[in-house]
């Protein structure tokens, strides 16, 4: 595993997530520098911190330096020139993870589109640096003229988009076929590493790769299950993360758009998180689902890892998420299978009602934890 120095914000949840991203990308964090501000003009950090970083970098000699914020090309170049190391900002790090995780032809195309969008946003500045005789440390472009460079990126983006459009049309045909056959559909959604794939495996009897690492799932997998003796199709989808830029969501649109067409979305929530992390992740999930046009009345909330908490802790967190009056949540354990049967029954009852607004069954801690 390659070594990395991590520069991140001085907040525990942010540090943990940044380290998780590094681990998922195959980097072992050997030193962490925590700062209140990471958006200073020249380096992102102050000159004093840069001097300290130079000393540490010379001593540790890491393979990369990970900067947990979005860097301008000039900032990336300035850091690389001062530290003589490859610099990865937050978005580049996520793209590294995506590239290593992509297994299907479609997910590889989606990652390529996201990479090209990342490159396009930085094209002008990189051309300017190149014309000045300065060579950025990451994605260097040599002496390309700006129009040649732009046209090259646009051409590659159009090629990838064309292939993704074909995949999207094929996906639409599959959706229409499932609808004609009368299949109801369920999709799992939620923050990355919340336990979606583990729950998917428990509900379907599958043995998909599951991990506590971030972004284990990049491509959609669909399987058939029976609920109340009726056939359903259930899909696992890519996880969300805070500060995921719009262009990355757009790149995975053909995969994520499944959420807009499914009958029920199971929003998987890691109820074992601290209240601060829980609120942040839940807010991020709901914002992303809203951007994808997913209606709240089609959502069911699976409060995963509930076997690790006392009833009172779960109730407190349900109040924190403003789900007390919502009738469509249930504490589960994807690992032990606890209440997974009840989750299926809840989904069946909702779909049988044909109108989620009229759904009246109350599911709560008292009703489910005794089973």
From Swiss-Prot:
Entries under PROSITE patterns matching the protein: G_HFLX (PS51705)
Gene3D superfamilies membership: 6.10.250.2860, GTPase HflX, N-terminal domain, P-loop containing nucleotide triphosphate hydrolases
Domain Hflx-type G intervals: 184-355
Origin: domain of life: Archaea
Binding locations of Mg(2+): 197, 217
Keyword GTP-binding carried by entry: yes
Subcellular locations according to the entry: Cytoplasm
SUPFAM superfamilies, alphabetized: P-loop containing nucleoside triphosphate hydrolases
GO CC, one annotated term: cytoplasm
Cofactor(s) listed in the protein's UniProt record: Mg(2+)
GO MF terms held by the record: GTP binding; GTPase activity; metal ion binding; ribosome binding
InterPro entries on file: G_HFLX_dom, GTP-bd, GTP-bd_M, GTPase_HflX, GTPase_HflX_N, GTPase_HflX_N_sf, P-loop_NTPase
Keywords from the UniProt entry: Cytoplasm, GTP-binding, Magnesium, Metal-binding, Nucleotide-binding
Record's keyword annotation contains Magnesium: yes
Protein task: GTPase that associates with the 50S ribosomal subunit and may have a role during protein synthesis or ribosome biogenesis.
Protein family: Belongs to the TRAFAC class OBG-HflX-like GTPase superfamily. HflX GTPase family.
Name of this chain's protein: GTPase HflX
Organism from which the protein derives: Nitrosopumilus maritimus (strain SCM1)
Gene expressing this chain: hflX
